[in-house]
Amino acid sequence: ILKVERTIINLMQRTSGIATQTNKLVKKVGKNVLVVPTRKTQWGLVDKKAVTLGGGGTHRLGLYDWILIKDNHIKLSDPKSYVISPKSFWEIECKTKSQVLKYVKQKPDAIMFDNFKPESIKKIIKQIGKTNIIFEASGNITEKNITSYAKSGVNVISLGSLTHSVKSLDISLDII
């Protein structure tokens, strides 16, 4: 036990901290919005499992899950030129209202609002109207403002802070 004690305790502290923080945020946003981590994880699948144990969901587990078109891809070529299988799930990251309104016409499975204010998201979603597109908020979302994002009409809220800057719980081992 003593040979692996520190490693096991470190892992337990980290994953317990992630699960606890996730659970706190899940309770704040309610049942209609899914709280997920971003891909910014130190321990990959271990961190993502901790999020699910806390009541959250997972974003992508890897590049094989779905296609995520980010700003760098958009700068290199127009997403209209991409050949995407109708069976593929794809999401596009948008940084401006004009991008959202442009790409919503291409009927992606999901649109990520990157660094938008909750009020802006709410207005844009209202302007788009009823759709089957999943809306995700990401960027600069904190425990203090997460409820505003949850009320904006999004289906998913992704936070890098769930895994890259969570406070580990204080756990120790006593042998009796």
What is each stretch, according to the model?
Residues 115, 139, 161:
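Short secondary-structure boundary segments
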Residues 172-176:
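Active-site loop ensemble at the mouth of alpha/beta enzyme cores that anchors a bound cofactor
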Residues 143:
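Cys/His-rich Zn2+-binding cysteine-cluster or related metal-binding knuckle/ribbon modules and their
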Residues 1-106, 110, 119-127, 133-136, ...:
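Acidic/glycine-rich phosphate/pyrophosphate-binding loops and surrounding catalytic core
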